[in-house]
Design a protein with these regions (language model features):
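As written
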Residues: 58, 92-98
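The feature encodes the CheY-like receiver
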Residues: 54, 84
C-alpha cells in the first residue's frame, strides 16, 4: 500500500512497484488508506507512508494503525522529505521499520529495500 498525497509521485511509485512484481494499492490520503484497510480482504505486506499528508501527519496515521490489533503488525516504511530527530524517533518508537529521506535515495533503491524486506520477512 502506498500512502502519498503527491499524485505524480504516487503514480510513479505504484508503477515501479507493479513493475517489480509487487501488487500495490494507491491512497492519496491517510483517511483513504485507513478506510481501504477496513475493506481489504487481505492486509498489505507493507505500507509506504509519506510523513506529510494533507489530512493527517504520519505520526497520527501510525497511531491509528497501531491502535487496531488487525493492523498493528503491518510493516511501515516512512518516506519523507524531512527527517528531524523528533520525527524519526517518534515514528520508529511507534514501530516504523525504516524512515527514509526521499532526497537521499532514488525511487528504485527505496522500492528494492521494501521488496527485500517483504521477500525475507514473509
Amino acid at each position: 500500500m502506498v500512502v502519498e498525497d503527491e499524485s505524480l509521485l504516487l503514480q510513479a511509485v505504484t508503477k515501479k512497484l507493479i513493475a517489480s512484481d509487487i501488487e500495490a494499492v494507491s491512497c492519496l490520503s491517510a483517511e483513504q488508506a485507513l478506510d481501504y484497510l477496513k475493506s481489504l480482504p487481505e492486509l498489505p505486506d507493507a505500507i509506504w507512508l509519506d510523513y506529510h499528508l494533507k489530512d493527517m501527519d504520519g505520526l497520527m496515521f501510525m497511531k491509528n494503525l497501531k491502535a487496531n490489533p488487525l493492523w498493528e503488525k503491518i510493516p511501515v516504511f516512512v518516506v519523507s522529505n524531512s527527517a528531524s530527530p523528533d520525527k524519526v524517533n517518534g515514528m520508529l518508537a511507534l514501530g516504523a521499520k525504516k524512515y527514509i529521506l526521499k532526497a537521499e535515495h532514488r525511487l528504485d533503491e527505496i522500492i528494492a529495500s521494501i521488496k527485500e524486506f517483504i521477500m525475507t520477512d514473509n
